[in-house]
């Protein structure tokens, strides 16, 4: 990056380290921040700093929060007998946006991936099993991603949870609304068929 002043090159380099941001997008963002009013850049810097200082993981579910427990775990209107297990905090956000789930969550912070050196001990599985000890939870919904790692994690968890006498279910993976069958991959079609329900 010899074409840029050193501070500009450092800014582009740091922006490019963010997931989903390539060199060209990093350059565009850097130039935007440098050309915008100073207050725009300062507000962004303050927001990042504040989030890093104030946000932590909920001691109950592992979701991102600025209170402990998080607002979901602290909500008395939530069903305590229903627990949805997800891989990442962003999965909680996706399910909450759908406004269909009224139970509690447990965030694993990843999935089992031998290729990446991630085993069960690196995930929040011990914490999950501890939550199930109380006997309050009657059903665990495994909402891991429809990937090899997500399926492996779901199978592993089901093997641990079923002996506890807790019902274990798996979300159905199917076609998104508006999708054409011809463009769907085999795993999606297979899961869509397996998860089919009787029409009423």
Curated annotation (Swiss-Prot):
Ranked from the top, the taxonomy reads: Bacteria, Bacillati, Bacillota, Clostridia, Eubacteriales
In this protein, which residues make up the domain named Toprim? 81-176
Give the Gene Ontology MF terms in alphabetical order. DNA binding; zinc ion binding
Annotated protein name in UniProt: Recombination protein RecR
User: Which top-level group of life is the source organism from?
Assistant: Bacteria
* Functional summary from the UniProt entry: May play a role in DNA repair. It seems to be involved in an RecBC-independent recombinational process of DNA repair. It may act with RecF and RecO.
Tell me which Gene3D superfamilies the record gives: 3.30.60.80, 3.40.1360.10, 6.10.250.240, RecR Domain 1
Zn finger (C4-type) start-end: 58-73
DNA repair keyword on record: yes
Q: Check the record and name the SMART domains matching this protein.
A: HhH1 (SM00278), TOPRIM (SM00493)
Q: Return the similarity comment.
A: Belongs to the RecR family.
Where are the coiled-coil regions? none
Q: Keywords assigned by UniProt? A: DNA damage, DNA recombination, DNA repair, Metal-binding, Zinc, Zinc-finger
Q: Which PROSITE patterns match?
A: TOPRIM
Q: Which CDD domains match?
A: TOPRIM_recR
The cross-references to SUPFAM superfamilies, in alphabetical order and at most eight, read: Recombination protein RecR
Query: What does the entry give for GO biological process?
Result: DNA recombination; DNA repair
